[in-house]
Curated annotation (Swiss-Prot):
Belongs to the MraZ family. Transmembrane segments: none annotated. Keywords: Cytoplasm, DNA-binding, Repeat, Repressor, Transcription, Transcription regulation. It comes from Photorhabdus laumondii subsp. laumondii (strain DSM 15139 / CIP 105565 / TT01) (Photorhabdus luminescens subsp. laumondii). Negatively regulates its own expression and that of the subsequent genes in the proximal part of the division and cell wall (dcw) gene cluster. Acts by binding directly to DNA. May also regulate the expression of genes outside the dcw cluster. Forms oligomers. It comes from the Bacteria. The keyword Transcription regulation applies. It is found in: Cytoplasm, Nucleoid. Pfam families: MraZ. This is Transcriptional regulator MraZ. The gene is mraZ. Residues 5-52, 81-124 form the SpoVT-AbrB domain. The lineage of its organism: Bacteria, Pseudomonadati, Pseudomonadota, Gammaproteobacteria, Enterobacterales. Gene3D superfamilies: Transcriptional regulator MraZ domain (3.40.1550.20).
Length: 152
């Protein structure tokens, strides 16, 4: 399980260094093999272990290519999916097209989200957090049953 937000830097080749606390888990679970793709709703990237990505690919394979909405999701997620291997120094090379999509240049936030990481431009991340907090404080929408049952 991945959690927490960590500021990291991309090097001049577009590599990020995975924080030490995640490396053993990633090597154990997937031998450092990862898959990165775009997020369909936010200006960030999604980074999965290969084993977790294979579960998603299986779900995507059950969608119909004849249904326009399902085909779009397949095209966007699979079309942007890029395998990346963590090297011995704990670095992952992100494809240039993915970095451009999310506006990743230098300062990046690696955000744990249970079974995956999100990769954000640092400024975009802080703006998203600010926007999310404002939305929560001003919402008039009733809470879903699941949120009502969540006790913190």
């Amino acid at each position: 399980m991945f959690r927490g937000a960590t500021q990291i830097n991309l090097d001049s080749k577009g590599r990020l260094t995975v924080p030490t606390r995640y490396r053993a888990m990633l090597n154990e679970e997937s031998q450092g093999q990862m898959v990165c793709t775009i997020d369909l709703h936010q200006p960030c990237l999604l980074l999965y272990t290969l084993s977790e990505w294979e579960i998603i690919e299986e779900k995507l394979s059950r969608l119909s290519s004849m249904n326009p909405a399902e085909r779009r999701v397949q095209r966007l997620l699979l079309g942007h999916a890029s395998e990346c291997q963590m090297d011995s120094a704990g670095r992952l090379l992100l494809a240039n097209t993915l970095r451009q999509h999310a506006g990743l240049v230098k300062e990046v936030m690696l955000v744990g989200q249970f079974n995956k990481f999100e990769l954000w431009d640092e400024q975009a991340w802080y703006q998203q957090v600010k926007d999310d907090i404002a939305a929560e404080q001003s919402t008039q929408e009733p809470l879903s049953v699941r949120l009502q049952e969540l006790s913190l």
